[in-house]
Amino acid sequence: DQNACSSPHLIVWAGKINEIRRQKFWKTLSNLVKLKYQAPELSSVDKYHKFCSDLIKLKDLNSVKIYDNCVYTLKLKKFSETMENLRGRWGYFYEFETKNINSISKNINRKYQTMTYFGFKKDTLKKFIISNNIKGIDRFVPVGSALDINFVWDGYDLFKSLTRIIEVK
């Protein structure tokens, strides 16, 4: 449903862009959604309403693609400072292409919580975080691990936050 804080809304394609692989990704996702997910009827109306609204409001759209009404993708021309306000639901995604992942760093703020990644080495991500002084994104996790919970969540040590220490002297 893409309603959780860990749900994907934006896909950033970084590096050398392969259009065939990108299309294959979206088609595979659409086919998987058709096989494994029964969306409520209202979701189609909500998704189409969002789509029409975005077509009117968003001035930096590069292209749009609809995959069997299961997946909608809106490719953006730029990674703007208000990107975190773009929220997709019911198989509705925004996407952005960049040759260099560092280009998105200046617009990442504290509203970003989790970045799931595929095709990046941990050292590359660490360099991205340190060299760009990233102010947001508390978790960088591989695709498929966004719901994994640990003692540190969204930058907070849950164990310390949810326990108290009683001192007797």
Say what each PLM segment does.
Residues 1-116, 126-167:
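NAD(P)-dependent aldehyde/semialdehyde dehydrogenase
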